[in-house]
A protein has these predicted regions:
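Alpha-helical transmembrane segments of integral membrane proteins
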Residues: 3-220
Length: 220
């Protein structure tokens, strides 16, 4: 792969940068799972006016441009890993919340749920022992698509100069550095971009595979 303009080995920097890029993607997915599950489970299980109110909150959150939210968080918190994680968590949980709500609305009137309630189990026990385990399949599939989305978002922010700042090293910062030397050393941009592409594609294939494996219709 060669070296950059300062003589640093590009392959080493790409491998080192993968730790931060993939970590941001995974942590964003976990944050989306926690926030989205709590929010969506509350809306789907309680229902009624609270459900309508919480869903209007999601509609408002969806109306805010993602880039604007990330820029505002970057200005308020700073251009660091913490700011990136908070910004990505704020824009990634809504889809998970809607999915969890839909699963809970579908399952909460099933006979085994009614039997659990009739046996005297608490609401928390019904949610964590019966509803969530039966709804976890589609949620896991959705989270596998959240990881590449977060990696792309972080890379885009770093690429346009609004994400991580030196000495932090991610694929986005490497691509941003490579852009400045594109005419002289195009490999500085091409190799980080290639690894971003391969990683995003791999997670998308993983999501497709999990979706097929967990879809009960494919077992017929």
């Amino acid at each position: 792969m060669g070296t950059d303009e300062l003589g640093r080995d590009l392959l080493t920097r790409v491998i080192y940068g993968s730790r931060l890029s993939i970590s941001i993607g995974v942590l964003t997915a976990l944050s989306a799972f926690v926030i989205g599950t709590i929010y969506g489970a509350t809306a789907g299980y309680v229902g009624g006016k609270l459900d309508a109110l919480l869903m209007r909150g999601i509609d408002i959150a969806y109306s805010l441009p993602d880039l604007l939210v990330m820029i505002l968080v970057g200005v308020l918190i700073g251009r660091g890993t913490t700011g990136i994680l908070i910004a990505l968590a704020l824009i990634s949980w809504m889809g998970t919340a809607r999915l969890v709500r839909a699963q809970f609305l579908q399952l909460k009137h099933e006979e085994f749920i009614e039997a659990a309630r009739a046996s005297g189990q608490s609401n928390l026990a019904v949610i964590f022992k019966h509803l969530l385990p039966n709804a976890i399949g589609p949620i896991i599939v959705a989270l596998t698509f959240t990881v590449p989305s977060a990696i792309l978002s972080e890379s885009t922010l770093s690429f346009i100069g609004l994400g991580l700042s030196p000495p932090a090293c991610s694929w986005g910062t490497l691509a941003s550095d490579g852009l400045r030397a594109l005419r002289i050393e195009p490999h500085l941009l091409l190799f980080p971009s290639f690894f971003i592409f391969i990683t995003v594609l791999s997670f998308n294939f993983l999501g497709d595979g999990l979706r097929d494996a967990l879809d009960p219709r494919t077992r017929l």
